[in-house]
UniProtKB/Swiss-Prot annotation:
It comes from Pseudomonas syringae pv. tomato (strain ATCC BAA-871 / DC3000). GO terms for molecular function: 5-oxoprolinase (ATP-hydrolyzing) activity; ATP binding. InterPro entries: Glyco_hydro/deAcase_b/a-brl, LamB/YcsF/PxpA-like. This is 5-oxoprolinase subunit A 3. Belongs to the LamB/PxpA family.
Length: 256
């Protein structure tokens, strides 16, 4: 039986500003990418999300970002390597402290937004993130875009790295994500999304935006928690995968 992880970006509300339905998503996903305060989230809200995740036995990951709350972490930044390393260490460490208080622990790191996309191809910034993880906890798993050069780079530097696919994003024929600035980049139909991901899990391929089939090898599937139909989409995806006898389990298990 093929096993796959379902993850979502959570803990992104800030003060009076609400983002997503964390409680509902935690009933569906197996891993939670929790904001660390740089692109979204505040300490009290992050702690609430961590406690809720612990109660549901959902695995926790640090959703690290560029320091960009105004742009929700989606603006490219040319950050110096030492600054980026320090920023990532700071975010992981902060989340580790809150997670301990919530009775859980951080098991992996998934960069957010522009940082995620940049380190998929930018070796300098990728190494800065890798150095941060090695410095604070080399046992943390790094989540990377399926097909990116980051996967082999991280593994060559001694980290465990897993590949991720996106349920609600369109793909180019080259296997990269279609830019959010392009029409059709974000998918909203729960049934369509679920069938696309079922094909991915069963055959290792996905239909690109031009109709061609692209090979994608992934250990985890992300459903963005901030999309309008996020909960409905995640629920339908889980239903379809379970109906097809797919085992849903976190890629980063508990440490012995």
């Amino acid at each position: 039986m093929r096993a796959i992880d379902l993850n979502s970006d959570l803990g992104e509300s800030f003060g009076a500003w609400s983002m997503g339905d964390d409680a509902a998503m935690l009933d569906i996903v197996t891993s939670a990418n929790v904001a660390c305060g740089f692109h979204a989230g505040d300490p009290a809200g992050i702690l609430r999300t961590l406690k809720a995740a612990a109660a549901k036995n959902v695995t926790i990951g640090a959703h690290v970002s560029y320091p960009d709350k105004v742009g929700f972490g989606r603006r490219n930044m040319d950050v110096a390597s030492d600054e980026l390393t320090a920023d990532v260490i700071y975010q992981i460490g902060s989340l580790q402290g809150l997670a301990k208080a919530a009775g859980t622990s951080v098991r992996y790191v998934k960069p957010h937004g522009a940082l995620y996309n940049t380190i998929a191809h930018d070796r300098r910034q990728a190494m800065a993130v890798i150095e941060a993880i090695r410095a604070i906890d080399p046992a943390l798993v790094l989540v990377a875009l399926a097909g990116s050069t980051l996967i082999e780079l991280a593994r060559s530097e001694g980290l465990q790295c897993i590949a991720e696919a996106f349920a609600d994003r369109a793909y180019t024929p080259q296997g990269t994500l279609v830019s959010r600035r392009e029409p059709g980049a974000v998918l909203h139909d729960p049934e369509l999304v679920a069938q696309r991901m079922l094909r991915l899990v069963q055959s290792g391929s996905i239909e690109a935006i031009d109709g061609s089939l692209v090979r994608i090898e992934a250990d985890s599937i992300c459903v963005h928690g901030d999309s309008p139909a996020a909960v409905e989409m995640a629920r339908e995806l889980r239903r379809v995968l379970e109906q097809a006898s797919t085992s849903l389990q976190p890629f980063a298990g508990k440490r012995s």
